[in-house]
Amino acid sequence: VLTDEDKARVRASWVPVGKNAELYGSETLTRMFAAHPTTKTYFPHFDLSPGSNNLRAHGKKVIDAITEAVNNLDDVAGTLSKLSDLHAQKLRVDPVNFKLLAHCLLVTIAAHNGGVLKPEVIVSLDKFLGDLSKDLVSKYR
């Protein structure tokens, strides 16, 4: 459960991510595909080369969806309900992939903001991304 302090840290640290959704999203997907090649199976129709139009467009969608969650921290599950349905019912994405994506996103954020991110901010972001992953798999039951 995110505390009020966690929520404030997440909102503040998310500003550069939300403003650069395509960059952060594309880098996160590139990192995930490199570190976890099995995740590529969900994107057979994509050009998965770093910086491709497909990765930039889908990466932006991912970050934009997470930005909506950041803007609605008191109802992340409700905010992501349709997205959870899509991934569970239609796309049938293995739930573990949300954790992999969350980890790669945290690494991407740290890579861009290394000196600025304090341990407590990293902890708050990690808690948020963990909760986000749980909310996305809620429709798998």
From Swiss-Prot:
SUPFAM superfamilies named among the record's database cross-references: Globin-like (SSF46458)
Protein name: Hemoglobin subunit alpha-1
Entry similarity comment: Belongs to the globin family.
Single Gene Ontology MF annotation: peroxidase activity
Binding sites annotated in the UniProt record for O2: 58
UniProt: heme b binding residues: 87
Keywords: Heme, Iron, Metal-binding, Oxygen transport, Transport
Assembly and interaction partners: Heterotetramer of two alpha chains and two beta chains.
Tissue: Red blood cells.
Gene Ontology CC entries for this record: blood microparticle; haptoglobin-hemoglobin complex; hemoglobin complex
CDD domains the record matches: Hb-alpha-like (cd08927)
InterPro entries, sorted: Globin (IPR000971), Globin-like_sf (IPR009050), Globin/Proto (IPR012292), Hemoglobin_a-typ (IPR002338), Hemoglobin_oxygen_transport (IPR050056), Hemoglobin_pi (IPR002339)
Entry function: Involved in oxygen transport from the lung to the various peripheral tissues.
GO BP term, example: hydrogen peroxide catabolic process
Record-annotated Globin domain positions: 1-141
A Pfam family matched in the record: Globin
